[in-house]
C-alpha cells in the first residue's frame, strides 16, 4: 500500500510540474530572452505578455499584443533558427525610464522571412530580467 501511495504521490508531482506554466524571467538576461521568445514560438502570446515586465504590459494591452504578434507570426511562419548575435548591459534605453537594461540581439530565420534581427530589451525587476520591448527587423 505504501509503494502505491508513494507512486501516486510521485506521479502527482510529475503531473504538477508538467502543467505548471514556464516562467520566462530568470536572473540571466540571455536565458530570460530565449525563454520568452520560446513562448511566442509556441504561440503562447497571452503568456508571453504576462511574463513581460511592468513597462511592457503598460505600453501594450494583452489583446493588442496577442493580435499583433499572431498576425506577424502567421506572415513570417515558424522559426527555423535563432542565434545570439550580441548581449549588452546598459543603464538607459530610448523612450524608457532610467534603470538596468540588457539588450539581446538575435540573428534569426523564419520560414518566410530570412536574415532577421530580433532585438529583445529586458529590464531588471526584483532581481529577474523581464522583457521590456521586442522588435524584429
List each language-model region with its residue ranges.
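Short, low-complexity N-terminal intrinsically disordered segments enriched in polar/charged residues
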Residues: 2-4, 8, 19-44
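Short solvent-exposed beta->alpha transition segments
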Residues: 30-32, 46-99
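Hydrophobic core
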Residues: 13-17
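Exposed beta-sheet edge and beta->alpha loop/turn motif
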Residues: 89-137
